């Protein structure tokens, strides 16, 4: 069967692969576009498997929201170059939309979710690996699902995203709080959420830093000094204790003035916790020249 330009074009639109790769697949499938597409999907999965052991610490976040439901997904790539590619951005957005629509609660469920074109997210990921030439992984997802006000924010570079679950208040306040979390990244919501082990460790550190003169003070005075320092530390690591980035009072004061309460928040930072590989290209070239 003749492999026409229109046939190649149609296969490219279906798979996102290069022209020569589409032509080769059509030739091997004797012009059967469905068989060619299926073969390319299998090939894409094989290529994806081969790239799966390469470190993917870059990427971006996808956000999807519908009323009282919102989802953030982290999709990783190997380089920032691919992370900024329009095809990668579109893929990430489609993953977030599928995660929200399917009601997925974890990454495996996200991978099984269907996209608008009928493919699963995992099938589309394998195709993206083939098309973009890098290891691409769907690493994490977080969601807020309820009847509260949601503050959703993804920083313009797509690297930091936040979902705030606000009881009472309005969307403007919720979004402002999400921006605050993105900027200052508090580990905890309120003082009650700070682990007791952390507080005890900080007490030990503050006591060790004190002069012998201060340590010799009466126990009640010493306790007040230590408590003051610990309260400051706890304020620094909690959303409620921090000074609001859009004002000059604490977040707790702002929230209470609005008659609201932050039930919790979700924060994702792309690549957080992944050890990046530092490439020494000079060493690689030198090694290659010795062969």
From Swiss-Prot:
| Database matches in PROSITE patterns | EF_TS_1 (PS01126), EF_TS_2 (PS01127)
UniProt keywords (A-Z) are:
Cytoplasm, Elongation factor, Protein biosynthesis
A molecular-function term among this protein's GO annotations? translation elongation factor activity
The organism sits in which domain of life? Bacteria
**Where in the cell is the protein located?**
Cytoplasm
Query: Can you list the GO cellular component terms from the UniProt entry?
Result: cytoplasm
- In residue numbers, the region (Involved in Mg(2+) ion dislocation from EF-Tu) covers 79-82
Q: Per the annotation, which location comes first and is thus the protein's main one?
A: cytoplasm
**Family named by the database record:** Belongs to the EF-Ts family.
Q: Which NCBIfam families match?
A: tsf (TIGR00116)
Q: What does this protein do?
A: Associates with the EF-Tu.GDP complex and induces the exchange of GDP to GTP. It remains bound to the aminoacyl-tRNA.EF-Tu.GTP complex up to the GTP hydrolysis stage on the ribosome.
Q: Write the protein's name.
A: Elongation factor Ts
């Amino acid at each position: 069967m003749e492999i026409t330009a229109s046939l190649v074009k149609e296969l490219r639109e279906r798979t996102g692969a290069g022209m020569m790769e589409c032509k080769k697949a059509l030739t091997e499938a004797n012009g059967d576009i469905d068989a060619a597409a299926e073969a390319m999907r299998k090939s894409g999965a094989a290529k994806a498997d081969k790239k799966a052991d390469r470190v993917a610490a870059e990427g971006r976040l996808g956000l999807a929201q519908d009323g009282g439901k919102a989802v953030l997904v982290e999709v990783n790539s190997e380089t920032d170059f691919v992370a900024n590619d329009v095809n990668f951005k579109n893929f990430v957005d489609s993953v977030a939309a599928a995660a929200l629509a399917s009601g997925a609660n974890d990454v495996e469920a996200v991978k099984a979710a269907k996209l608008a074109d009928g493919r699963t997210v995992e099938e589309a990921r394998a195709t993206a690996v083939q098309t973009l030439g890098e290891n691409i992984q769907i690493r994490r997802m977080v969601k807020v699902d309820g009847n509260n006000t949601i503050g959703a924010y993804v920083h313009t570079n797509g690297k930091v995203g936040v979902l705030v679950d606000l009881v009472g208040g309005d969307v403007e306040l919720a979004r402002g709080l999400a921006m605050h979390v993105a900027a200052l990244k508090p580990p905890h919501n309120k003082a009650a959420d700070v682990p007791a082990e952390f507080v005890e460790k900080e007490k030990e550190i503050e006591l060790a830093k004190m002069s012998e003169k201060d340590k010799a003070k009466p126990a009640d005075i010493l306790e007040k000094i230590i408590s003051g320092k610990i309260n400051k530390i706890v304020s620094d690591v909690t959303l409620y204790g921090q000074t609001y980035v859009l004002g000059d009072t604490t977040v707790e004061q702002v929230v209470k003035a609005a008659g609201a309460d932050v039930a919790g928040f979700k924060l994702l930072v792309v690549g957080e916790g992944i050890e990046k590989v530092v490439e020494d290209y000079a060493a690689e070239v030198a090694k290659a020249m010795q062969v």
